[in-house]
């Protein structure tokens, strides 16, 4: 299956990298690469492996060794990554809480 990242998810990855880079630039790049690689590896083979999402029509992928949640949807043959955020964030009060499954922005 094909995996596509929304602009919102790409912005999330940029923000994650910028935040971590304040203290450790090398770790910042490694973290983002790990999120992207693990997400692709898991979802391209097992698109339903995430748990049902808190937003209707989504699923959530959580990796124990990476403290980030990947919100995605699978409306057909393409997996759409909608958002990525740290598990310590308050999901209900995220500034980008308005995740819409369609259309992707």
Language-model features: locations:
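Enriched for short, Lys/Arg-rich terminal
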Residues: 68-69, 73-105
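A general structural signal marking secondary-structure boundaries and capping sites
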Residues: 20, 24, 43-47, 88
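Outer-membrane beta-barrel domain signature
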Residues: 7, 31, 37-45
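Solvent-exposed interaction patches of small proteins and small membrane subunits
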Residues: 23-24, 28-31, 51-58, 83, ...
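Short amphipathic alpha-helical/adjacent loop interface patches that line ligand
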Residues: 13, 17, 36-40, 65
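Arg/Lys-rich, positively charged N-terminal/basic patches that mediate binding to nucleic acids
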Residues: 1-33
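Basic/aromatic recognition patch in beta-strand/loop cores that engages polyanionic ligands
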Residues: 36-37, 45-79
């Amino acid at each position: 299956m094909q995996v596509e990242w929304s602009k919102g998810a790409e912005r999330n990855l940029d923000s994650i990298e910028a935040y971590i880079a304040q203290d450790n630039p090398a770790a910042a790049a490694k973290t983002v690469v790990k999120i992207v690689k693990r997400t692709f590896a898991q979802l391209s083979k097992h698109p339903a492996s995430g748990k049902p999402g808190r937003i209707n029509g989504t699923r959530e992928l959580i990796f124990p060794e990476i403290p980030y949640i990947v919100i995605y949807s699978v409306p057909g043959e393409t997996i759409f990554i909608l958002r990525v955020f740290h598990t310590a964030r308050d999901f209900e009060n995220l500034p980008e809480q308005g995740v819409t499954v369609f259309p992707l922005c």
